Each structure stands twice: as C-alpha cells, then as structure tokens.
C-alpha cells in the first residue's frame, strides 16, 4: 500500500491542516452544487501542541481492502475523499463514512476495523495525524496502555 506523506512542524500546523480539510470539504460541496456547510465538529484533547507536528497522509483503499488493527500515538482527523470506508474505533459502533464525511480517533484508541465498504469501487482517505515529534505515528495491533 502506498501512502504519501507531507510533514510540517510549524506552530500553525493545526490551522493549516484545518484549512486543508475545509478546502477539501468545500470542493466536494461545490462539485455537488451545494452551498458550503459544516462538515465536522469535535472537541480536541486539552494539550499545548508544543513539540507536536501534523502528518498528512493519503490512504488509498483498493476495492475490498481490509486494513489491520492499529492505533496512533496522537489524535487523528480523517476525511473521506472518495468512496466509502467502514471503521470501528474502540468504544464506538462500527460505522460507514462516505465521501465528504470525517471521523476522529482519540490518542491511543484502537482502530479495530478499517476497510473499503465496496468490493468493486476504490476509496480514498485523507488522514491528519497530530503527534509529538519523534513518536511512532501508527503501530499495528491494539493499544496496550492509555495515552
């Protein structure tokens, strides 16, 4: 699986990442001929962001692709660019997210299910992973301790 990644360490990384997501959401809305609207609202962890960075990854899902159980050191904002993705994060119900929808993963939460909802169409996800500099971003398997 190919994942393209861009990293930044500037203090305005959060603002830049949210601007990127806003642009992606606005583009998806414009293609549908609708007015811009709120796509996602979620409280973020109480943290300072000093010595943190954001990593933006493009995650393609081939038809029928099933990802492995994993967790992240930091928190994740994920935006579905194309298709539909089935996800289940520890403590939550399994859910299908379609083009233009987003979800949040708390630091250390286990991503139990991550798969393409279609066996015939591809899906694409844009993942913004916010973590401390030097942390391993994605670790296979369930989290063994709370972060």
Indicate residue ranges for each PLM-predicted region.
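Glycine- and acidic-residue-biased ligand/ion/polar-headgroup-sensing regions
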Residues: 74-91, 101
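Boundary at the C-terminal end of the N-terminal hydrophobic targeting segment
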Residues: 26-30
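Histidine-centered metal-chelating micro-motifs
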Residues: 66-68, 86, 103, 107-116
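A short glycine-rich, His/Asp/Glu-containing loop-to-beta-strand
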Residues: 34-68
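Short acidic-glycine-tyrosine-enriched beta hairpin
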Residues: 91-108
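Ligand-binding loop in jelly-roll beta-barrel domains
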Residues: 108-135
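N-terminal secretory signal peptides and thylakoid transit peptides that target proteins
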Residues: 2-21
């Amino acid at each position: 699986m190919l994942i393209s990644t861009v990293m930044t360490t500037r203090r305005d990384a959060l603002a830049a990442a949210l601007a990127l997501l806003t642009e992606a959401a606005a583009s998806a809305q414009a293609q549908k001929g609708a007015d811009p609207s709120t796509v996602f609202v979620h409280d973020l962890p109480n943290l300072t962001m000093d010595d943190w960075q954001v990593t933006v990854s493009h995650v393609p899902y081939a038809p029928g692709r099933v990802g492995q159980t994993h967790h992240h050191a930091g928190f994740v904002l994920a935006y579905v660019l194309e298709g539909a993705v089935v996800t289940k994060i520890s403590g939550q119900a399994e859910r299908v997210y379609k083009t233009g929808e987003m979800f949040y993963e708390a630091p250390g939460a286990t991503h139990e299910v991550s798969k393409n909802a279609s066996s015939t169409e591809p899906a694409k996800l844009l993942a913004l992973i916010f973590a401390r500099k030097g942390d391993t971003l994605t670790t296979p398997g369930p989290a063994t301790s709370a972060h």
